[in-house]
């Protein structure tokens, strides 16, 4: 019998280390020597080993000092209840070719068909948002907050679930202020976030197999937050934390394997559009002059888009029979290549630049495919289609401008399509090539202009949302959503255009004699007369207003964003990052005990109902101490008159169902300077501007007596009274808010102003500069 085999089995090799309880020798007991000074010997004995002598320093006896700090204690409410808010949400959902968008802004969109979401997100969490998720059946509360008007916040545990194929990078911020700036979205780009030491990688199961399928992160309370009891109404809108997340590609960080180059190509408008870019009606005459110059330049017609836009107009019989050219064949150049004659054309937008072309119809040797009769077709087609659009739409459509029409206007695909019969004979555009790994960011500028602006130069007042000195691949990340939040225009993708200035492109998007000059890029689909995504179904209203906007420039930003390092290349139709959260709260208060009396004669069953017991959750916005009964309100079996009067002021709930919030609540707010806020509010409330500029302790009549006297003469007495009434009402609202804040400070219920939402602190209330 091989019983000894078990003893002979080789043990697993381990690194040798000394056990803490074993010593090579032990301290030896010896006679204590006389010492002078402030040290004395200490004799200790250990088990086993040799003896060894040990010493310790003599502790100097000093005078007793007072305590540097004291502990301030707060009385807790009589009733306390722990509550965990547990739920599941998608941190981000990224559809195909939506990498550069912000999912937090598009989370509540209902567009279909088409991709949804974005490749990055800036989510915030508040108690109101958690209650809103509860109303959407996205989380559950382990305890009810009914009649408990106080609360404490203890932190949150987050669990991020790894995707099978796509990697993610997240960053959790608990440092106020929780506001977006022009640098927030570029810093969330995977190429930038990969360099952040506080970022956490969420690798896919494919990139890092064999590990847990989730990553747990423990997050405490926000910085500068004092842990004490607060009314739920005060913590309702306080931002607890923000989550920045983005999709990334760890397997192919420097370009997709489905492409043969990392260079990005797009087109920009030529300089002929510089002074004719506005869409205002008073600039129509200038646009007509430019359109005439473009239509007279016959080499621009050397493209297949000429057939797509103008041939249906001829085939439909829109040309009068008396004209000699009634068929499409009459507009084609029939001159053979053997002819050595040439024709000189003046390039549009200039008076001195000329281009010499052969008269033959061979476009590969700089010939023209069409003859001079085609010059009038674009204007005739644009005029007819523009009038037809106005007739169909009726009073809802007031624009009748053939220069902006889809088929033959200034931005028709005949002039802007990159597909030419010969690649060296371009249209009214310039091909731009961009290598993301040569971009240092120095001198780059990215901004938007309203469609009414009359030039392409950057202006500090008219231009908005400037991002400078950053690589284009980072500046393009989440840019459109930042512009929408910064300007407050949710339809900005149809009301503004994008301009770029960069010395790191080929050719350079830079004019050395005019440093503020920008260039208008557009996507390949817009140049071909298609919608974003490649659809040929252009709406009839958009065909009458066909010009480059952010809606048609989004694909350029998408290509720039995907060219950066570690960027997700949108290889899957839809990806999502799931998260589970567990927010820890404590509800407290002094509620009136509610005694439930049941019918003793009714038959009851020992077993409970099959339906899970539901909790009564109250909106934290209305769960305030003023609207809650407390134990001190109940005297001798009755409620006091003050308590009844206070409860009668509670607002009643209505059954009107709204269409939803204009912007998702989880989306973070944007930072506005005090100067921008004053400019916006001065447009909405002109009388309030006088209240903020002139302090109440100064005499404004002496300083502005001359300017105000002329205004008072023109205004009637009723108008002056209305303005004064409006000023008094606004001032009254601010004073009431001021007294409310002072009362909270006296009650030790104040919150750090940096944690409050925008407009909730005294500095923003009275425009005090930080």
UniProtKB/Swiss-Prot annotation:
Residues 647-682, 697-717 are annotated as: Disordered. It is found in: Virion. Residues 666-681 have a biased composition (Basic and acidic residues). The keyword Repeat does not apply. It holds the Pfam family TT_ORF1. It comes from the Viruses. Keywords: Capsid protein, DNA replication, T=1 icosahedral capsid protein, Virion. Residues 647-656 have a biased composition (Polar residues). Residues 703-717 have a biased composition (Low complexity). GO terms for biological process: DNA replication. GO terms for cellular component: T=1 icosahedral viral capsid. Belongs to the anelloviridae capsid protein family. May self assemble to form an icosahedral capsid. Presumably essential to initiate and monitor viral genome replication by a rolling circle mechanism. This is Probable capsid and replication-associated protein.
